[in-house]
């Protein structure tokens, strides 16, 4: 959790700030991605809102649960990491299909795709070790 906590805080609080800024139309046109005024693109962008907020809820909840020494924090963290990867992947895939290569938005979404991979590996390894251990103790028929 030592290394994961800063990523969760930056990402989860970042999402909350992004959606507040987006709701109040505070993003300058020069910073916005291509076709930001297009109603279809606006709908596409807002389609991420439930996913991004769920990422923030699960990520921040995992930090809270970790501080309360509740083992379930790992489940919340894993869900948050998977959803974060998916959020970044969806945006990158859309921009590839629409041939849009704005480096600023790509960097932010590649961050969302890449950072979870380092931590997912630790969760998967941990689960794999636990599964192997439970199979060793199982009786065969």
Labelled PLM ranges:
Residues 57-78:
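Juxtamembrane helix-break-helix junctions at the cytosolic face
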Residues 34-42, 97-111:
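Non-cytosolic membrane-interface motifs at loop->transmembrane helix junctions
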Residues 52, 74-93, 109-116:
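Hydrophobic alpha-helical membrane segments
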Residues 11-54:
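Hydrophobic transmembrane helix segments
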Residues 1-10:
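N-terminal membrane topogenic signal
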Residues 112-133:
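Membrane-water interface at the C-terminal end of transmembrane alpha helices
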């Amino acid at each position: 959790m030592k290394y994961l906590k800063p990523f969760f805080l930056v990402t989860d609080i970042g999402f909350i700030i992004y959606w507040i800024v987006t709701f109040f139309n505070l993003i300058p046109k020069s910073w916005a991605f291509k076709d930001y005024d297009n109603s279809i693109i606006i709908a596409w962008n807002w389609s991420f809102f439930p996913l991004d907020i769920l990422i923030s809820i699960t990520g921040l909840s995992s930090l809270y649960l970790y501080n309360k020494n509740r083992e379930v924090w790992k489940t919340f963290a894993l869900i948050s990491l998977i959803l974060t990867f998916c959020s970044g992947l969806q945006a990158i895939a859309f921009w590839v299909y629409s041939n849009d290569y704005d480096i600023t938005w790509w960097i932010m979404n590649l961050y969302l795709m890449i950072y979870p991979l380092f931590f997912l590996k630790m969760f998967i390894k941990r689960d794999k070790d636990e599964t192997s251990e439970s199979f060793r103790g199982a009786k065969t028929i």
